[in-house]
Amino acid sequence: MENIEKLLMQEKILMLELDLVRAKISLARANGSSQQGDLSLHRETPVKEEAVHSALATFTPTQVKAIPEQTAPGKESTNPLMASILPKDMNSVQTENRLVKPLDFLRPHQGIPIPQKSEPNSSVTLHRVESGIQHPHTNYYVVYNGPHAGIYDDWGCTKAATNGVPGVAHKKFATITEARAAADAYTTNQQTGRLNFIPKGEAQLKPKSFAKALISPPKQKAHWLTLGTKKPSSDPAPKEISFDPEITMDDFLYLYDLARKFDGEDDGTIFTTDNEKISLFNFRKNANPQMVREAYTAGLIKTIYPSNNLQEIKYLPKKVKDAVKRFRTNCIKNTEKDIFLKIRSTIPVWTIQGLLHKPRQVIEIGVSKKIVPTESKAMESKIQIEDLTELAVKSGEQFIQSLLRLNDKKKIFVNMVEHDTLVYSKNIKDTVSEDQRAIETFQQRVISGNLLGFHCPAICHFIMKTVEKEGGAYKCHHCEKGKAIVKDASTDRGTTDKDGPPPTRSIVEKEDVPTTSSKQVD
């Protein structure tokens, strides 16, 4: 019995120690730091020892309950199913901060409120937070040459400034100091102006004409504002013209020199037809649509061979483009066949005030066979500004010839006719009266001495000779006073070049008021 009493006493002591350990663990969790828990354990060790000694001092054998007699040997331990081990029969434990009850151990978080996260108030914690922040690294890009040369801090702006521009050079640097040093070294070597720094928000990269830089126009985003309707399967068509349609004399001279010096090595989508004084562009599939538009405005195109999606002519005037689409869908059975646009055009004329005459075009649409491009040769370009009028007169004569040849064709379908443009195609049937009247009206409007925007006696003389061969008559009241000058000029020309235009420098008169002309063709 004495051994049993000792064992029971040791059991109670161990239970007290266990309760103390649990209470201290709970207190350590409440403080939120294991270090503080260790310090609390160290500080409360005398309390624990005092509680143990007091329990031993007050213990007497009479307080021990006798264990009921067991029915079998080895069953002297307490029955685990007895209510004495339930939490309600266990004693409360006093700690430094609060009275911990055994029932608390069965509650969520052991009856201890979850401590709130405190703000970092130490330099160590602040340093730990700042060390986790990653500052983005900014690269700098130097565009050395081209229309948008400068120093950029954004790759998107740099790409827009260099994309599609031939011969442009650019490089990336890690710091603005390195970028500035490289830019200054380049400008000093090239003896050009100092490159400016262009931040992201101040970059203004607007598309320029092909004559200045080959930059494609930006794609236009579609904005759908209607609610409750189905979005169309395709985006809206781009604007008809994405740049200024009026061509300047400098742009014309640039395109003229480009056609004369083109040798066919740099671009497989272009070949040229070279004559004595002028070279005309021929555009194949995948040609640059903006260059097609500018060459069209300059009157320097002979033929266009567009793709099935007609992307090469998407910047031409809308009515011309629509006429080509109607021909493709309504006039040929196999819409997948390749087509061509054969263009006969005048060239622009300028005065001191600016553009005087825009080109006029006669366009033939047809089904294209196998393309056999002519060999492009680099021709010598010696044109001067004073020679542009003579070149315009020559193009005007060829334009009139092409327009009058329509009278010999009996099977023509007029696809579109405008003030300065006629689009036609061949037809399997004879020309109907409506189309014939449209052709005659267009001829009467444009075939005159004022074809180029001013009265040109050389054009009148050419028209008169051409109409007389057809058995008709042509009269111009502007030429009545200058018949002798025209005859003398034509006589001088016969000794040199019978087919070329007469000299025009001394006989060109600017038209102030539109003139009336008559044309009779038998």
UniProtKB/Swiss-Prot annotation:
Keywords: Host cytoplasm, Translation regulation. GO terms for cellular component: host cell cytoplasm. Residues 487-500 have a biased composition (Basic and acidic residues). Pfam families: Cauli_VI. InterPro entries: Ribosomal_bL9/RNase_H1_N, RNase_H1_N, RNase_H1_N_sf. Residues 487-522 are annotated as: Disordered. The keyword Calcium does not apply. The keyword Transmembrane helix does not apply. Gene3D superfamilies: Ribonuclease H1, N-terminal domain. GO terms for biological process: regulation of translation. Its main location: host cell. It is found in: Host cytoplasm. Enhances the ribosomal termination-reinitiation event leading to the translation of major open reading frames on the polycistronic viral RNAs. Belongs to the caulimoviridae viroplasmin family. The inclusion bodies are the site of viral DNA synthesis, virion assembly and accumulation in the infected cell. This is Transactivator/viroplasmin protein.
